[in-house]
């Protein structure tokens, strides 16, 4: 059974490099992280798809901020927004896709 998946295995944090050239860690996506993302964004993940359709950039910035806030609580949302260019948005799209897959 080589393809067996260990559902208890801990997911490793990911890192992204933002426009300031610094590497930032993204937390593993677990229940606490997801709950904190909802709290930070002010809406449940069930509304994420419609929010992305209606307010794409605002919602993307909120997701990225919520993720970074887990590891870097000193960042504020405007600061995070200034650190994100289209290049950075594409580099974290996989993580955002993982979150959306759960909704």
Can you describe what each PLM-predicted range is?
Residues 18-24:
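Glycine-centered positions within short beta-strands or beta-hairpins
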Residues 2-13, 25-103:
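Short, surface-exposed, charged amphipathic helix/loop patches that serve as local interaction elements
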């Amino acid at each position: 059974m080589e393809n067996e998946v260990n559902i208890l295995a801990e997911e490793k944090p990911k890192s992204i490099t933002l426009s300031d050239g610094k590497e930032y860690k993204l937390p593993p996506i677990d229940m606490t992280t997801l709950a904190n993302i909802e709290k930070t964004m002010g809406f449940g993940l069930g509304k994420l798809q419609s929010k992305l359709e209606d307010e794409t950039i605002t919602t993307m910035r909120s997701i990225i901020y919520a993720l970074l806030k887990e590891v870097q609580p000193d960042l504020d949302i405007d600061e995070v927004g200034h650190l994100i260019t289209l290049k950075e948005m594409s580099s974290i799209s996989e993580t955002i896709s993982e979150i959306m897959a759960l909704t």
